[in-house]
């Protein structure tokens, strides 16, 4: 009997019953994919969807993003009814589009419009990775190009928040040509003295990273964002070298001169406000007709 006192007993983990799981409504708790901490969802939302334990930036949808940076009630949306078709008759593409529309309550992977930041008018575009992984098809490219042209007409800055897996394969070359179309629109805006701020969020990859996302007068990013063209494995197989652990992160790009700043979500609105304030009455006043 005494000998049993010094024997290490096996530890058992209690597994919640199915009834216990059902007692916690869906969406009440959120698990951080980085530190694995489980938190109340309302606590994460209150903190702009940033983990209160490790600072991981959870993805934001387009409306959450707009609410976090624009003055309350100032946003006016552009081209809301524009939707993608299936010009290449790609199998199941229309069904997938319809599924994403129902799931996200969006017509496409980008929301564009105008609003104010501390009463300064801007045209803004926000990509939403919930819709076809934020991929760029004809409508995404067209909406962004139109938004840039609107910024040109209004003589105001253009700001974009990117989150994308790249060009949309279901639209083939029609998708790839959006890289050129958006870049040309931005060049016109730039030549006229227009300010363009690009904010890259997780993930910004493929044709989006290789076109408009990297063309900002200011290129910013959120902490830990994955930014790059090809995938890590493809690059390693091509160069036959092991890449650094932090390769293609926002911090790696900042260290190597490809970003101007990595900005915490808490500081994003204020950082944008300061940039806009610097350019008020400066180069923005020297518009060419």
UniProtKB/Swiss-Prot annotation:
Domain CoA carboxyltransferase N-terminal as annotated: residue spans: 28-289
Cofactor(s), by name: Zn(2+)
Location relative to the cell: Cytoplasm
Catalytic activity: N(6)-carboxybiotinyl-L-lysyl-[protein] + acetyl-CoA = N(6)-biotinyl-L-lysyl-[protein] + malonyl-CoA
The protein's role, per its UniProt record: Component of the acetyl coenzyme A carboxylase (ACC) complex. Biotin carboxylase (BC) catalyzes the carboxylation of biotin on its carrier protein (BCCP) and then the CO(2) group is transferred by the transcarboxylase to acetyl-CoA to form malonyl-CoA.
Annotated keywords: ATP-binding, Cytoplasm, Fatty acid biosynthesis, Fatty acid metabolism, Lipid biosynthesis, Lipid metabolism, Metal-binding, Nucleotide-binding, Transferase, Zinc, Zinc-finger
Sites where the protein binds Zn(2+): 32, 35, 51, 54
GO BP annotations listed: fatty acid biosynthetic process; malonyl-CoA biosynthetic process
InterPro entries in alphabetical order: AcCoA_carboxyl_beta, Acetyl_CoA_COase_Trfase_b_su, ClpP/crotonase-like_dom_sf, COA_CT_N, Znf-ACC
This enzyme's EC code(s): 2.1.3.15
ATP-binding among keywords: yes
Name this protein carries in UniProt: Acetyl-coenzyme A carboxylase carboxyl transferase subunit beta
Family membership: Belongs to the AccD/PCCB family.
């Amino acid at each position: 009997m005494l000998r049993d006192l010094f024997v290490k007993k096996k530890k058992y983990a209690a597994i919640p019953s199915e009834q216990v799981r059902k007692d916690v409504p869906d969406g009440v708790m959120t698990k951080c994919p980085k530190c694995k901490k489980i938190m109340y969802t309302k606590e994460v939302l209150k903190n702009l969807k940033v983990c209160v334990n490790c600072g991981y930036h959870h993805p934001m949808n387009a409306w959450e993003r707009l609410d976090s940076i624009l003055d309350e009630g100032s946003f006016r949306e552009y081209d809301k009814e524009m939707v993608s078709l299936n010009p290449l008759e790609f199998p199941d593409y229309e069904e997938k589009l319809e599924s994403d529309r129902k799931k996200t309550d969006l017509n496409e992977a980008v929301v564009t419009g105008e609003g104010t930041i501390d009463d300064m008018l801007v045209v803004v575009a926000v990509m939403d990775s919930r819709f076809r992984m934020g991929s760029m098809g004809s409508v995404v490219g067209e909406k962004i190009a139109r938004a840039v042209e609107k910024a040109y007409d209004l003589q105001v800055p253009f700001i974009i928040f990117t989150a994308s897996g790249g060009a949309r394969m279901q639209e083939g070359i029609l998708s790839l040509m959006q890289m050129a179309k958006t870049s040309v629109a931005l060049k016109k805006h730039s030549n006229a003295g227009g300010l363009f701020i690009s904010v890259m969020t997780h993930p910004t990859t493929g044709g989006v990273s290789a076109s408009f996302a990297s063309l900002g007068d200011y290129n910013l990013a959120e902490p830990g964002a994955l930014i790059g063209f090809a995938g890590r494995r493809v690059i390693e197989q091509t160069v036959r070298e092991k890449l650094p652990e932090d390769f293609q992160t926002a911090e790696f790009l900042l260290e190597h001169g490809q970003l101007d700043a990595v900005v915490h979500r808490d500081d994003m609105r204020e950082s944008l406000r300061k940039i806009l304030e610097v350019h008020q009455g400066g180069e923005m006043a020297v518009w060419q007709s």
